Amino acid sequence: MEDNLEKRVEDWVSTRIGVQYTSAKERAMRLLEEAVELAQAENITWNQAVAQIHYVYGRSKGEPEQEAGGVAVCLLGWCAAHKTTFQEIALREIERIEAKPLNEIRGSLARKQDADLVHGEESAEHA
């Protein structure tokens, strides 16, 4: 069952959250959320995070697949720094979310919707 992690996660999102949340843009928003949470867990300050966002948005927009490759390389490097593997952390998280009750998943989604973090409107400044 762990052979195709992408399909496993896609199926989980589709069946537990909803097909409308499988779009590339929605997945990028969730990736941003998780990346910020990881940075926060690693003691990256608010000011450092905001400075990084200003730096990135001050440059030309990249190609999604190349940027996703960069995310993958950075995550692999983070795994190496923590003496773990991507497979290990990914499987542990997939098993954790698959075990979550549906009402807990939907509650988390509702909180994100209330905060306008799901399907939010783009800022004209950075569109």
Task: Label every PLM stretch briefly.
Residues 1-68, 72-127:
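Flexible "arm" and connector segments at domain edges
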